Amino acid sequence: MSKEEIWDKVLELAKNELTPISYSTWFEPPKTELIDIQENTAIILVESNFVQDFLKKQYTDIIADLIEKAIGTKLMPNFVIQEDLTEDKQVKDSAKAKSEAKPDVQAPQNSSEDQFNVHNTFETFVIGPGNRFPHAASLAVAEAPAKAYNPLFIYGGVGLGKTHLMHAIGHYVLENNRDAKVIYTSSEKFTNEFIKSIRDNETEQFREKYRNIDVLLIDDIQFIQNKEQTQEEFFHTFNDLHQTGKQIVISSDRPPKEIAKLEDRLRSRFEWGLIVDITPPDYETRMAILQKKLEEEDVDIPLESLTYIANQIQSNIRELEGALTRVIAYSRLQNEAITTELTAEALKDIIQTPKSKKITIQDIQKVVGQYYNVRLEDFAAKKRTKSIAYPRQIAMYLSRELTDFSLPKIGEEFGGRDHTTVIHAHMKIQTDMSEDPIFKQEVENLEKEIRNQ
């Protein structure tokens, strides 16, 4: 596979996994280019020093993971600008340094702060009504591992601060106990390492790595659904850590009861401690997040421009910060002062003005009803024939995915059904989608149609 083919594949994955703002701002061609692969390093050419610094801080691990998904081999990215390439030796030295600095996958990373983003601390976390309780719980766990809440299970949508809190816990524990053994990983990395340990006959080393620690922080646990062997291994890892008084912190995009194809014994253990959810930030919190980001960037932006960003991007902190970074980058590259007009111009490809119509449950029922030939009134009726009940479950699933309405409110819009019925419908459709690619595509097409109304 050529460098161009590899990078095309990485960009295709990035487009699916990153937010539209992040992808179009930093990676959309021709903003990045894979120019060389040396030992364990991918040399990636970017446009400017500003972009280089930002990608190094925010995207090194993400791009490494995407490269591994694309080609099956983990390469650490080294972001370079044209000036770095004046002498080929510079690139080679850089690649060598990167390779030598990279720890072996089985080597203990337990007490290394390199696992954590230096910016993701409790001090930089902006507290608001939607995250106050998760922040307090995370701080309590960091101050007294395995004494407060064990496990701590944090769930919420993409880009709301779950990973920030997990990194903050790691930083705090290590700052207060340099001998502590802390591992932060994702369920996907855990799975990949487990598979590799079986293939290489190194399961004992794998278990030593994950069980001889003080704190385990595991992100995106929902991705172990359907992975029976991984669930079995994680079950025993969980038990070993919990029984020996070690702290476990887990994050997910949904609560344990809504993770389909998860063993009941694992679901039960996830519910042993404290479950907290992070919700989208309100206007005041969004403004505070933008102000905090400005302090980090040491940039002044007119209040009107900040207000514009906060009003246009409401549900995702990552997209909110990405929008601000895009505006700053656009201003610097255009050599223009930041104004409301420039802000709107910088974000015109990302947000719609006037603001997009908010999706309602009635919108969802209308689209699903038209597709499956179900009358609107039948969504609220007591009829249980499959030709009506199944489209009703699909509409409930989409209502949970595409709106911010509570479970009781969704149930109310479907004839006063109980919130447990909504949960069951969501899990049922989620399971069916995971088992049937054609049905999954069908539901995704419905979602696109609803969003594009």
Swiss-Prot record:
Region annotated Domain II sits at 73-114
**Cited Pfam families:** Bac_DnaA, Bac_DnaA_C, DnaA_N
- Extract the ranges annotated as region (Domain I, interacts with DnaA modulators): 1-73
Q: Name one GO cellular component term.
A: cytoplasm
Query: Which InterPro entries is this protein grouped with?
Result: AAA+_ATPase, Chromosome_initiator_DnaA, Chromosome_initiator_DnaA-like, Chromosome_initiator_DnaA_CS, DnaA_C, DnaA_dom, DnaA_N_dom, DnaA_N_sf
UniProt superkingdom: Bacteria
Q: Which GO terms describe its biological process?
A: DNA replication initiation; regulation of DNA replication
Keywords per UniProt: ATP-binding, Cytoplasm, DNA replication, DNA-binding, Lipid-binding, Nucleotide-binding
Protein family membership: Belongs to the DnaA family.
Instruction: Quote the PANTHER family the UniProt record gives.
Output: CHROMOSOMAL REPLICATION INITIATOR PROTEIN DNAA (PTHR30050:SF2)
What job does this protein perform? Plays an essential role in the initiation and regulation of chromosomal replication. ATP-DnaA binds to the origin of replication (oriC) to initiate formation of the DNA replication initiation complex once per cell cycle. Binds the DnaA box (a 9 base pair repeat at the origin) and separates the double-stranded (ds)DNA. Forms a right-handed helical filament on oriC DNA; dsDNA binds to the exterior of the filament while single-stranded (ss)DNA is stabiized in the filament's interior.
In the record's own words, the domains note is: Domain I is involved in oligomerization and binding regulators, domain II is flexibile and of varying length in different bacteria, domain III forms the AAA+ region, while domain IV binds dsDNA.
Q: What is this protein called?
A: Chromosomal replication initiator protein DnaA
Q: Which organism is it from?
A: Staphylococcus carnosus (strain TM300)
